Amino acid sequence: PNERVPEYTKEERQRMQRAFGYTYESLKDSILPMAKNGIEGTSAMGTDTPLAALSGNREPLFNYFKQLFAQVTNPPIDSIREEVVTSTTVYIGAAGNLLEEKPENCKVLRINNPILTNTDLMKIRSMKVEGFKVETISIVYYKNTSLEKAVERLYIEADRAYRDGANILILSDRDVDDNHVAIPSLLAVSALQQYLVKTKKRTSLSMILESGEPREVHHFATLLGFGASAINPYLAQDTVKQLVDEHMLDKDYYAAIDDYNHAIISGIVKIAAKMGISTIQSYQGSKIFEAIGIDKEVIDKYFTNTVSRIGGITIKDIENDVNTLHSAAYDPLGLETDVTLDSKGRHKMR
């Protein structure tokens, strides 16, 4: 990895993994097969695990959303045999006024797929090109303070960046430590997406997420579906480095990262194809999900117009879940904590 990209010690990495809800299964059954084979791990059809709202575990917010699929109107696409009609290319930057054609509208950054390596993000962050201005906004907040207030602060920071001329926002939770907790990445992305739409600023800004939370294909699909333009899963990629260093992967770091990223993007294309969508750009911001077990007030405020037939967790419940995970990684009393990853039995009976 590039020297200028932040790296973690083994203990720091384990604490971050626990803070973001990683389990032993996340490494063994999700990240390892993808980094090893370049495709998602194979498993049996069907699931008998409890819904996230009924689970006794602290489930990530991603798991409260179910993917929809085409049933009547646009037919699904075979993403393998019809790969020629699919595209993973995305464009980052201000979209300009769609009703006024002019050359400035075409000044965007073209990237081959929305899953960024640490080096890719570093290049975008340090870009000094006329017509592009990149601003990083932290999506962490001081522990024991309000998650709802932290989201409101995110709106204020985005408004400030917009006034300063930024057209690319990087939402980053790299500052998580013993005193700072991350806003759940899906909540941060969707809340800001809805705010920018309501204030008529969305087409002037692109959102890139730099987060340690996403690691499975469904996580990335929800983030793109709720408004992210691109995602840098820095902790998942650092976990791949861990697997290489521990000789659980018989390949070099760069090849393993390429295979992991390829598995993620292939999985996203497959999910989009179920709805008859052939390009990632068309899938972005589409919100083709159904929420199960989230309170109506949370849906209306942060996931506006998302299908939701039953209520459930409130913003306070989400805050409590985040704080519980953080306390398991960074003991609030400053005592030594066991940072070994738990096995939750999500993929196999325990």
Task: Kindly give the residue locations of the regions a language model identified.
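Flexible, glycine-rich loop/tail regions that form catalytic "lids" or insertion modules at the edges
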Residues: 1-150, 154-161, 165-168, 214, ...
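Conserved structured catalytic cores and adjacent interaction surfaces
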Residues: 143-146, 150-219, 225-227
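Short, acidic/small-residue loops that bind anionic groups at enzyme active sites
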Residues: 195, 235, 256
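Non-cysteine beta-strand/loop elements that form the S-adenosyl-L-methionine
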Residues: 229-236
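Short gly/pro/ser/thr-enriched loop/turn and capping motifs at secondary-structure boundaries
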Residues: 237-244
